[in-house]
């Protein structure tokens, strides 16, 4: 672990709390500022490895929690995991078998970053569209979603896409986001629930 990690307060706090990555601190902050998960919600985590968000979700809800990732996830008590592409119809069928209903979806998935921002952002938007496709198939009407993306020329387009699917949409930049990062979270509440093929406020971390 490089020295920059040793100086990273979010990383140190996550490690001290037993979480698998600093991303756990982001989710805790996001939900504290945007309470979109209820105590009995069934939550689906897309792009869940290494599992830090699953750990946080397990603390927040007594509902069914399922994590999906291309990579294996070490076991977490009370959490089910699926190895596979979350847009794969076979994986969608597996999720349906494990979850009676999906009240919330979280997605912290990110492409492997090349360092070329426009290219990386375009690939992130593709992942966002895939996650929205899953929501349209599985998310219960009135459900909520938290999704990571990256600011860039296509971000407004994505934001408007999400607004077509949810009654309330806002953006949130976590305090624990690294300096210079274009990372931005979309907080979407009250899914309209069309369940068809894919198809207001804006704040920063001080909200």
From Swiss-Prot:
SUPFAM superfamilies associated with the record: S-adenosyl-L-methionine-dependent methyltransferases
Gene field: rlmE
Enzyme class (EC, first level): transferase
Natural source organism: Methanospirillum hungatei JF-1 (strain ATCC 27890 / DSM 864 / NBRC 100397 / JF-1)
Binding positions (S-adenosyl-L-methionine): 51, 53, 69, 85, 108
Protein name, UniProt field: Ribosomal RNA large subunit methyltransferase E
GO CC, any one term: cytoplasm
Catalytic activity: uridine(2552) in 23S rRNA + S-adenosyl-L-methionine = 2'-O-methyluridine(2552) in 23S rRNA + S-adenosyl-L-homocysteine + H(+)
Any Pfam family: FtsJ
Function comment: Specifically methylates the uridine in position 2552 of 23S rRNA at the 2'-O position of the ribose in the fully assembled 50S ribosomal subunit.
Similarity section: Belongs to the class I-like SAM-binding methyltransferase superfamily. RNA methyltransferase RlmE family.
Alphabetically ordered keywords of this record: Cytoplasm, Methyltransferase, rRNA processing, S-adenosyl-L-methionine, Transferase
Compartment annotation: Cytoplasm
Keyword check for S-adenosyl-L-methionine: yes
Gene3D superfamilies assigned to the protein according to its UniProt record, in alphabetical order: Vaccinia Virus protein VP39
Record lineage: Archaea, Methanobacteriati, Methanobacteriota, Stenosarchaea group, Methanomicrobia
E.C. numbers: 2.1.1.166
Keyword S-adenosyl-L-methionine found: yes
Single GO MF descriptor: rRNA (uridine-2'-O-)-methyltransferase activity
Catalytic residue positions: 148
